[in-house]
């Protein structure tokens, strides 16, 4: 039997793959969070609640209207994105010129309200969401049995992350968004509707969280607590990558997911804290994060 640092290679590769799967969700959630902070300078504590809303939207669309997974994969992010647009338009926009603390407190309170509402109606226990038939079954890789759905999650996550990065960094719309963040008055003087851009940006970030939520539903079950259990880890990932850095959020999300998975092989007791240890070390050496820009 082949060993790596005293660990059977099957266990090593298995946890490597599981870490990549978890990293796919970390990357998507970190991406939405980084977009909102990078463009709006808002620390969005409601991101975990929006992730949970995406999962519930998919489940309720199936339960109430018989909407299948593939259609819900489109509708759930749109629904949650629209709720994000409403929140930004009528509440969050009023806080932009104030200290960041106000936005953080507002979104933290919003997260508590959303989570409390869903807990009141659906309880705290998880509810199953069936894997679509097209993605049921699995593949024997030799070192582990990989469910096809989890392989799909990794591929879909990479496509979404790369596509979003290209949208922000390589398109005219992305250039407008970045310029509006740096100098909104100048951009508005060219006839560009900056408030609308900011509203759509928050809607995009919310929609990305919801997309991650519905993709996670068949794996982790649907629960009002699923977002609150994850959001602190995602914030740590964004800090390590660099607050507001799109590429930093993506790369760090995948990397720390893999590191967390491998830690479960070599030192399982530390697997729940390894991301926070890395965050502390990075902040000591590079306070702006690995991909962030120094102030």
Listing of model-derived features with the role each one plays in the protein:
Residues 1-28, 57, 68-72, 98-102, ...:
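Membrane-interfacial amphipathic/re-entrant helices at transmembrane-helix boundaries
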Residues 55, 59, 77-83, 110-118, ...:
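Hydrophobic core segments of alpha-helical transmembrane domains in multi-pass membrane transport
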Residues 66-110, 117, 251-256, 286-287:
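Alpha-helical transmembrane segments within multi-pass membrane transporters and channels
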